[in-house]
Amino acid sequence: MWTFIHKLGSPPWFFGFSGTLVRWLLPITVTLLLVGAIWGLLVAPPDFRQGNSYRIIYIHVPAAVVALAGYYVMAFAGAVSLIWRIKMADVTMRAAAPVGAVLTAIALVTGAIWGKPTWGTWWVWDARITSMLILLFLYLGVVALFEAYDNKTAAARACAVLSLVGMVNIPIIYKSVDWWYSLHQPASIKFTGESAIDSSMLYPLLLMIVAFYCLFTVTLLLNMRAELVWTHRESGWLKQLVGDS
């Protein structure tokens, strides 16, 4: 296990390993997305209150869930970068930030679209929505910081600190509907107790969440590989690996 973790810190080994992983994971991701989308958007029954307008949850919920998970990845990479000074952690941080930002933006936009027929308005300064907007700003802040510094080491340290400080927002997002009066409904999926959503709607939602996790992983790996290509474009190991492929 420790040998594998140590290998992940090696750019040449990671580049080769990630290429193989992407080739396997990409068709799985596409299949899961297609099956989940067809199941949720076309096969699942309409909601007895919201009709077909609820179907946007098959995009909204997976995007929101994986956006939060992506922040954990970025913050963990930031901690590794600060403590052990591992360069691949910096690459992970930089690659995760734009992916997380896009997912958060998708969650906010689809939430607004869903909110119009449900709440009668596109936007309210609800605790859950506001904390998700802060999450978007945190992701964009990391992207901007990496671009603002000429010194990559200084940029990575600044981004790591911002990522770790931003972790305080994550429990606020999770618990906002419990801590404050909120228009946003409580969690529909529960691991303890009965879920608030019927199984005919729940199963395609779970499948879409898995599909979005796979999509995040593939996109993250591709971003990391692109960063390695740019950073090590003159390195012999990269030319050899690209030539062999």
PLM regions and their residue ranges:
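Polytopic transmembrane helical bundles with strong interfacial aromatic enrichment
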Residues: 1-245
